[in-house]
Amino acid sequence: MTSHAPDPIHQFEISRLINVSIGNVDFSFTNVSFFIIATVVLSSVFLFISSSSRRLVPTRMQSISEMAYEFVASTLRESAGVQGMKFFPLVFSLFVFILVANFIGLFPYFYTITSQIMITFSLAMLVILTVIGCGFYKHGIGFLKLFVPSGVPVMILPLVTVIEVISFFSRPISLSLRLFANMLAGHITLKVFSGFIVSMVGLGFIGVGGSILPLIMTVAITALEFLVAFLQAYVFTVLTCMYLNDAVHPGH
């Protein structure tokens, strides 16, 4: 949704805004860098404004921030217990960042940073590395019990352990791909339909009549994309809470 180029993939192109290179290393400031900073700034400003003047009868902004707080807190408590609340700052930051980034990308000419696999994979790796680091810090070598389910017959225990290890280290892949693929597919679909409408209108009166149905579809898909933007942030947060439970309670 970031341009009117005929190619629906063009909107995901990474472009340099400020060229910076040191030796053979490229440190250029890109459109992705800009929208990452914009997402952080907008999230921070919204949370600051909504929480700076708290009222007994909450404003709309205060209600939204309190709902986000309660959602993350309750999800974390249900998944990892009271001990899991120490991860609240991380989980809340991830939820707000992904949600705001997804919503920003729905506006014309704005870039969707969550449609870049490098961004979503970085967020997923942050979660998994936190699980591993905190798990070993809290339990030491006992964290490895995560890969040895209790009650499994000795004969098949090695096989089950291998499956558990593969499953654990595939988490960042599935977590990142889910968010990346949904945002990418949705924006490509919108671009295709909007491009079709422009092409139909260019045909004249008959084309205008034929563009009504695609226009209705585009509006419906746009509304659906707002829902998907929230759901993907929701799913990422829920799965993050479930994974962080392994750092607190590694035993099956």
UniProtKB/Swiss-Prot annotation:
Signal peptide: none annotated. F-type ATPases have 2 components, CF(1) - the catalytic core - and CF(0) - the membrane proton channel. CF(1) has five subunits: alpha(3), beta(3), gamma(1), delta(1), epsilon(1). CF(0) has three main subunits: a(1), b(2) and c(9-12). The alpha and beta chains form an alternating ring which encloses part of the gamma chain. CF(1) is attached to CF(0) by a central stalk formed by the gamma and epsilon chains, while a peripheral stalk is formed by the delta and b chains. It is a multi-pass membrane protein. It comes from Bartonella bacilliformis (strain ATCC 35685 / KC583 / Herrer 020/F12,63). Keywords: ATP synthesis, Cell inner membrane, Cell membrane, CF(0), Hydrogen ion transport, Ion transport, Membrane, Transmembrane, Transmembrane helix, Transport. PANTHER family: ATP SYNTHASE SUBUNIT A. It holds the Pfam family ATP-synt_A. Key component of the proton channel; it plays a direct role in the translocation of protons across the membrane. Coiled coil: none annotated. GO terms for molecular function: proton-transporting ATP synthase activity, rotational mechanism. It is found in: Cell inner membrane. GO terms for cellular component: plasma membrane; proton-transporting ATP synthase complex. The chain crosses the membrane at residues 29-49, 87-107, 117-137, 146-166, 196-216, 219-239. Belongs to the ATPase A chain family. HAMAP family: ATP_synth_a_bact. It comes from the Bacteria. InterPro entries: ATP_synth_F0_asu (IPR000568), ATP_synth_F0_asu_AS (IPR023011), ATP_synth_F0_asu_bact/mt (IPR045083), F0_ATP_A_sf (IPR035908). CDD domains: ATP-synt_Fo_a_6. PROSITE patterns: ATPASE_A (PS00449). This is ATP synthase subunit a. Disulfide bonds: none annotated.
